[in-house]
């Protein structure tokens, strides 16, 4: 029986490359001359700390970071940015989290979407991923289209496609 897994992962090496590219762009931009602005990627907690001297510059840095992430193949929706920007001393910063794995509420929504599509497939939750099995390849590809079309706030990848 054909099957595949639905996962949500971010390649940390690509994220590191995007952070390095964004740092290089900030160093060369005229509007960030003589300004303390930086990006810090923490591999352990999977967060990116964006630091600058004012709140609007933090927002500009976030836009630069999103563009660089997109160029490296990481969707902007995989970056979870809190609304409030923290002010500490003379710097402003925000810690954006990279979304890894699928939360249980989102998993249930995906399984419900698959069941509501009336396709002849079975979806089962396995840890932080979802295994989908069906009799035909076409049904599985239709499930992929349903999951991509659903607006669930994070990107999904499809792995272990077996025939």
From Swiss-Prot:
Which Pfam families would you find in this protein's record?
DUF520
Q: Which InterPro entries match?
A: DUF520, UPF0234-like_C, UPF0234_N, YajQ-like_sf
Database matches in SUPFAM superfamilies: YajQ-like
GO annotation, cellular component aspect:
cytosol
UniProt-recorded Gene Ontology molecular function terms: nucleotide binding
Domain of life here?
Answer: Bacteria
Which UniProt keywords are present, listed alphabetically?
Nucleotide-binding
Q: Which family does it belong to?
A: Belongs to the YajQ family.
| Task of the protein | Nucleotide-binding protein.
Q: What is this protein called?
A: Nucleotide-binding protein YajQ
Originating gene: yajQ
């Amino acid at each position: 029986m054909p099957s595949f897994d639905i996962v949500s992962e971010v390649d940390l090496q690509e994220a590191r490359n995007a952070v390095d590219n964004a740092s290089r762009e900030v160093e060369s931009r005229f509007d960030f001359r003589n300004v303390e602005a930086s990006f810090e990627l923490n591999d352990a907690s999977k967060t990116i700390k964006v630091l600058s001297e004012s709140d609007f510059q933090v927002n500009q840095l976030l836009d630069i970071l999103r563009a660089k992430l997109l160029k490296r193949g990481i969707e902007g929706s995989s970056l979870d940015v809190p609304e409030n920007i923290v002010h500490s001393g003379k710097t402003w910063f925000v810690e954006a989290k990279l979304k890894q794995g699928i939360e249980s509420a989102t998993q249930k929504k995906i399984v419900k979407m698959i069941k509501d599509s009336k396709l002849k497939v079975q979806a089962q939750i396995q840890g932080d991923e979802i295994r989908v099995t069906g009799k035909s390849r076409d049904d599985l590809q239709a499930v992929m289209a349903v999951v991509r079309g659903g607006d669930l706030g994070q990107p999904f990848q499809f792995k272990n496609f077996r025939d």
